[in-house]
Structures are given as structure tokens and as C-alpha cells.
């Protein structure tokens, strides 16, 4: 049986040939999963889908949470305090949090990418740095840059990628984890100590990464291996 992966979509207003707004998922996620032997199906961020999240997740083999705009700071007990915050969607937040919590309860494998690692942390009670430029000497070091990442040797992410120093790790974010949620363990750091990977060890395979492995997965084996490891976890 082909593993079928649920991926919550996001609202988009610029789809060619579609009248009005539409929902989208990134093509590169689907292609990376397909190379690993799975297939991606989108869940639309509307109230009816969120209300049925537990039943919906139960029908799938795993979950990917994709990158996107920022999470509403009210979700982690703060008010917006940076003009750099962008792309907040309450519906998007609600669906992803519901899907993450359902996946954890049902012990489904989860791969949470970029915004995904952030909302995984928020869903479990953690907080975020609202703008890295406010806390790092080089505030642009994670915005559309490739940089080194150091992984814990025995972590799920290192085992999946088959390395502790993955090549071509592309970051495109201005926020990151601040206070780590209970239960999560840090398994990867950037040279500036920004959290780059987390895992929920109490469950089957819950992994979050701050960079975008899908961006280079078609040419860089280290990055594709993360998707391979995710799909392999479904079979175990």
C-alpha cells in the first residue's frame, strides 16, 4: 500500500485560472514524498475540516506541516511586537494545531517544516522569537540562506538523513523557537544556536526542522533522506 500523507493547505489569492481565492500546498513537498514512495493529500483550512481533524488524521498514514506565514502571537500568550510579522491566518493556525494534536494522540508520524516546527512547538505549549533580528547579531542569517546545521548523532533526524551535518540546508525564516514546549527535545542547532530540529521522543516519529529540506531534496541526498526516513517510519 502506498503511504498517504495529510498536508494542511493554506489560503492563496493568486492562483492562475481559479476564480476567487484557493488553497495550496507546496509542490516540492509532494515531489519529495513521491520520491520516497508516498503521496500527499491536502486538507483545506476551513472550520469544517478543523472540527473533523481527529477523524481526518485517523484516515491517513502520516502528516506533513509545511512552511508559510507567521503564527498569531496570541497563540503563545504574547501580543505582536514586531513589524516584521506577516501572513497571519487564524484558520491556518487552527487547522494545523488541531491536526498536530490529533496526530500525536493517534501516534502518527509527523514531519513539521519551517513554520511547521514553530507551530508544533506552539501547539504543545512553547513560544517563539517573533523576529530573529531582535535577538541575533546577524538578524538576516536565516533569511534565504544556506548554512550549517549540527544534529545530535542518535536523533531520529540524524538517523533519517544519515549524517550529523547535512549539506545544503536552506533557511528562509525570521522567527524561531524561543521557549521549548514540554516533551520536545532539541536535536539540531545552527552555529548561532538557533534551534533547527526538535523531536517528541514519547511518540513514534514526531520530527520538526526549521530549514526547508524540500528545496534541495531533488539534488541533495541528505535532504531527500529526511523524507525517506519519514515515509519509512510509517511502515514500522
Regions found by a protein language model. Name each.
Residues 175:
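Alpha/beta catalytic cores of group-transfer enzymes, especially the acyltransferase/condensing modules
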Residues 1-111, 122, 129, 133-161, ...:
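N-terminal beta1-alpha1 cap of cysteine-dependent amidohydrolase-like domains
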Residues 114:
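Conserved G/P- and acidic residue-centered "switch" motifs that form tight phosphate/ATP-binding loops
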Residues 172:
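DNA-recognition element of transcription regulators
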Residues 207-210:
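Active-site-proximal beta-strand elements of phosphoester/diester hydrolases
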Residues 117:
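The feature captures the ABC ATPase H-loop/switch
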Amino acid at each position: 500500500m502506498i503511504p498517504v500523507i495529510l498536508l494542511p493547505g493554506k489560503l492563496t489569492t493568486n492562483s492562475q485560472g481559479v476564480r476567487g481565492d484557493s488553497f495550496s500546498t507546496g509542490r516540492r513537498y509532494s515531489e519529495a514524498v513521491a520520491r520516497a514512495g508516498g503521496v500527499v493529500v491536502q486538507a483545506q483550512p476551513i472550520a469544517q475540516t478543523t472540527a473533523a481533524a481527529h477523524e481526518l488524521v485517523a484516515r491517513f498514514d502520516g502528516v506533513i506541516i509545511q512552511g508559510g506565514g507567521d503564527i498569531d502571537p496570541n497563540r503563545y500568550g504574547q501580543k505582536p511586537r514586531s513589524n516584521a510579522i506577516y501572513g497571519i491566518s487564524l484558520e491556518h493556525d487552527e487547522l494545523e494545531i488541531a491536526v498536530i494534536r490529533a496526530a500525536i494522540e493517534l501516534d502518527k508520524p509527523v514531519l513539521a517544516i519551517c513554520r511547521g516546527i514553530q507551530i508544533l512547538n506552539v501547539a504543545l505549549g512553547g513560544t517563539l522569537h517573533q523576529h530573529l533580528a531582535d535577538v541575533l547579531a546577524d538578524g538576516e542569517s536565516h533569511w534565504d540562506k544556506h548554512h550549517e546545521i549540527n544534529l545530535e548523532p542518535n536523533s531520529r533526524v540524524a538517523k533519517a538523513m544519515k549524517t550529523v551535518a547535512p549539506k545544503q540546508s536552506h533557511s528562509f525564516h525570521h522567527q524561531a523557537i524561543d521557549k521549548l514546549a514540554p516533551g520536545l527535545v532539541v536535536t539540531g542547532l545552527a552555529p548561532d544556536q538557533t534551534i533547527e530540529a526538535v523531536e517528541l521522543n514519547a511518540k513514534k516519529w514526531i520530527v520538526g526542522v526549521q530549514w526547508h529540506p524540500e528545496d534541495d531534496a531533488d539534488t541533495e541526498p541528505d535532504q531527500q533522506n529526511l523524507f525517506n526516513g519519514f515515509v519509512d517510519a510509517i511502515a514500522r
